[in-house]
Amino acid sequence: MSTSKPDNALPRLEASVSRREFLVRLGVTGALIAGSGLATRRLWQPDHFVPGFQEEKGLQLKNYALEASKVLPSMAIAHGLDHEKTVRAAMAALGGMGRFIQKGDVVMIKPNVAFDRPPALAATTHPDALRAVAKLVLEAGASKVIIADNPINSPTGCFFKSGLSAVASEMNLELMYPESNSFSPLSLNGEILKNWTFFHQPFKQATKVIGLSPCKDHNLCHSSMTMKNWYGLLGGRRNQFHQHIHSIVSDFALMMKPTLVILDGMNVLMSNGPTGGRLSDVKPMNTVVAGTDMVAVDAYGYTHLLERDLAELTYIHKAHDRGLGNKNWKDALYKEVQA
């Protein structure tokens, strides 16, 4: 990560700024004592605290994970040809959605909607996967379902093109777009991630969190699955983490303790990820993996869905070595079923 010093000059406030401009040029309300070098508040930048201002500790996310079961599987693998039936089979094998969601829960589902791509290209969470998971969550008694992501491309365009906004409208789910006031500073004692702006708004209401991600190739870190999915919660100039991509992805297993993760491997983007662009890059694998250990789920996804050697996936080994999950997924209690 760059160590260059930021400009200490205050950014000019405008009547209307975009979300990304806001995160880069966040202003401070309140007076500064001109020329004295003193300030009443510190300036928050997305990648660092500005020198000369008092450093303030950011928030820490709550742990949404449930206590591990000694008798129920921690991972389930389902194979089938129908999206909803395969999702349901995976969740039934895991003990049912009722194991994770109780009546009255507010459930935040984090899909991967980074790009404005249609579902057929497998670069984003498939609308059929979202529909299936949301149905199960509502059937389990959730009072509200929030869908949220911070896409690279236009949020409205990404949710529309991916088909997820249509599902949200159809099922009366709350679709929460990132706005300038949706972000808060996050503090984490990560290998790379220390202090950063974070899409915190959906977590203010959530009592349970589910990660729902596609399984796809990624040109920088080999793959994007359940761990990499949390990258979409960061604000600011997050592309500067690309030079430490495996470290930042392993940090997400420290940052996020979700209730459940679901890896959609019905159609896998085998090459030219993360954006894709050709139907020939997509291979039907007809598999859904659900579990409580992101590291284990991704280890299965990399070897059995992307069909690659796990030895090359550095972020999995980093997370495993840090005790954030188990890359040896067969060591866990798991169940494999046919939908």
Which residues make up each language-model segment?
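N-terminal and secondary-structure boundary signal
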Residues: S2-A339
